[in-house]
Amino acid sequence: MRKVTKAKPPELYPPEDGSYLRGNDYSPVAVVILLHTDYDKIPAFLKDLSKVAVEAGAALAGFLQTEKIGIEKIICDVVANPNIRYVILCGVESAGHHPGKTFEAFAANGVDDNRLIIGATSLTPYLHNISLEVIERFRKQTKLMNLLFEDDRKLRTDPETVKRVINACI
């Protein structure tokens, strides 16, 4: 059996500001919760979901509101922690930006030479602020655990479901 070693994240980890909680730096899991409201109006059930994720062992748990800068920040924060191998995507899709569908397309297809997310249908699915190397490293480093495929909206935001997926990844 191969020995798994854990790396200490850099001193300034996570490098990007954002609306997230930091948990166990040595965990292989980050949780991305889609946000369908403004940051100052985050519903209690979504705030609780991020707390549950960190308490269940996630390295990071936070919100994704936009398909461009939001995804770029997630990529930077995840790549900065080499221990993260799984990204759990959950929550409720935002009507305007479709960050969930865009994140799914990014995980599945990557970007073209102009950093356009292949297969994305959102308005601005470009990742201009990070290098192609960092983008590719994220895609090689992580596997998407997608809860958005569930038709049941409650299941996509169910704390027990998120805990079970985190435990399966750990």
Locate each region found by the language model.
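N-terminal donor/sugar-recognition subdomains of glycan-related enzymes
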Residues: M1-S27, Q141-I170
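Long, charge-dense
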Residues: G91-D152
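Residue-identity detector for threonine
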Residues: T5, T37, T66, T102, ...
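Conserved mixed alpha/beta catalytic, RNA-binding, or beta-rich assembly cores of soluble enzyme
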Residues: R2-N114
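Well-ordered, non-membrane alpha-helical segments in soluble/globular domains
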Residues: F45-K47, G70-E72, P125-L127, D158-I166
